[in-house]
């Protein structure tokens, strides 16, 4: 069984046991989160349920494995011949989750 869920403005195709890096969720490590924005559910018998826009009554339960930050992205701006240089870094926060159960 698989599902397509929306979290953090992005869509992910997930199955039970998958490990994902998603945009930061406000949850503690080793807690469970429910993702209820399910767009599509594919069952083992080949049946596919498509939501309009969400599948009613469908939930995906996931366990939070870690909270962290991605690698640093360096933004460097400059203007030639004007002695203007600006260096800025950014590390995007993420949440590492493992899909435990898909309820449809």
UniProtKB/Swiss-Prot annotation:
Coiled-coil portions: none
Keywords: Ribonucleoprotein, Ribosomal protein, RNA-binding, rRNA-binding
UniProt keyword annotation of RNA-binding present: yes
Gene Ontology cellular component terms for the protein in this record: cytoplasm; ribonucleoprotein complex; ribosome
Family annotation (InterPro entries): bL21-like, bL21-like_sf, Ribosomal_bL21, Ribosomal_bL21_CS
GO biological process, one term: translation
Pfam families per record: Ribosomal_L21p
A single MF term (Gene Ontology): structural constituent of ribosome
Family per record: Belongs to the bacterial ribosomal protein bL21 family.
Assembly and interaction partners: Part of the 50S ribosomal subunit. Contacts protein L20.
HAMAP family (UniProt xref): Ribosomal_bL21 (MF_01363)
Function: This protein binds to 23S rRNA in the presence of protein L20.
Protein name: Large ribosomal subunit protein bL21
Origin organism lineage: Bacteria, Bacillati, Bacillota, Clostridia, Eubacteriales
């Amino acid at each position: 069984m698989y599902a397509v869920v929306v979290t953090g403005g992005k869509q992910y195709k997930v199955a039970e046991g998958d490990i994902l890096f998603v945009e930061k969720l406000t949850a503690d490590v080793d807690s469970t989160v429910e993702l209820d924005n399910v767009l599509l559910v594919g069952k083992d018998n080949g049946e596919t349920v498509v939501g309009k826009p969400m599948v009613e009554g469908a939930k995906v339960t996931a366990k939070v494995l870690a909270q962290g930050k991605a690698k640093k992205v360096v933004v460097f701006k400059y203007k030639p011949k004007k002695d203007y240089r600006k260096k800025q870094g950014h590390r995007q926060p993420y949440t590492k989750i493992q899909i435990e159960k898909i309820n449809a």
